[in-house]
């Protein structure tokens, strides 16, 4: 049996640009792509935290160290500069591969610089104001 699993997650990145007239895709700083194990041309989902829009597109490598998160083409009607987004990549694994399976979960700061790398998709970094869905308030 094959299962589609979370492979890569860039959490709470800030959109730096959006342009209807670019070829459709999402431009991502090469440092973040490397950290999250996302390849150019790889299918990704983008979830806009500010407005709830969710879309599927593909990754384009942006300038290394620039912090760029660019929404290109028609998606620029759904996601705007300044919006916080989650960028998600998935992998298809057979059951034998799942024993060594570990997603790459990247947290970034307001300039889209990596501040934390983990493997737990539900982890909420201390002091982030985020909640871990596995741990109710007060535990």
UniProtKB/Swiss-Prot annotation:
It comes from the Bacteria. The active site is at 25 (schiff-base intermediate with substrate), 58 (proton donor). It is found in: Cytoplasm. GO terms for molecular function: aspartate 1-decarboxylase activity. GO terms for biological process: alanine biosynthetic process; pantothenate biosynthetic process. Its cofactor is pyruvate. It holds the Pfam family Asp_decarbox. One of its GO terms (cellular component) is cytosol. This is Aspartate 1-decarboxylase. Binds 1 pyruvoyl group covalently per subunit. Disulfide bonds: none annotated. Is synthesized initially as an inactive proenzyme, which is activated by self-cleavage at a specific serine bond to produce a beta-subunit with a hydroxyl group at its C-terminus and an alpha-subunit with a pyruvoyl group at its N-terminus. It catalyses: L-aspartate + H(+) = beta-alanine + CO2. Its EC number is 4.1.1.11. Pathway: Cofactor biosynthesis; (R)-pantothenate biosynthesis; beta-alanine from L-aspartate: step 1/1. Catalyzes the pyruvoyl-dependent decarboxylation of aspartate to produce beta-alanine. It comes from Corynebacterium urealyticum (strain ATCC 43042 / DSM 7109). The modification Pyruvic acid (Ser) is found at residue 25.
């Amino acid at each position: 049996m094959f299962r589609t699993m979370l492979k890569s997650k860039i959490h709470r990145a800030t959109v730096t640009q959006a342009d209807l007239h670019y070829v459709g895709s999402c431009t991502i700083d090469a440092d973040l792509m490397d950290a999250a194990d996302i390849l150019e041309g790889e299918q990704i989902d983008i979830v806009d935290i500010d407005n709830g829009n969710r879309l599927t597109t593909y990754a384009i490598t942006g300038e290394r160290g620039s912090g760029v998160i660019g929404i290109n083409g028609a998606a620029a009607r759904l996601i705007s500069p300044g919006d916080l987004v989650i960028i998600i990549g998935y992998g298809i694994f057979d059951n034998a591969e799942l024993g060594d399976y570990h997603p790459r979960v990247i947290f970034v700061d307001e300039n889209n610089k990596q501040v934390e790398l983990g493997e737990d998709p539900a982890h909420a970094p201390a002091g982030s104001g985020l909640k871990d869905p596995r741990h109710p308030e007060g535990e």
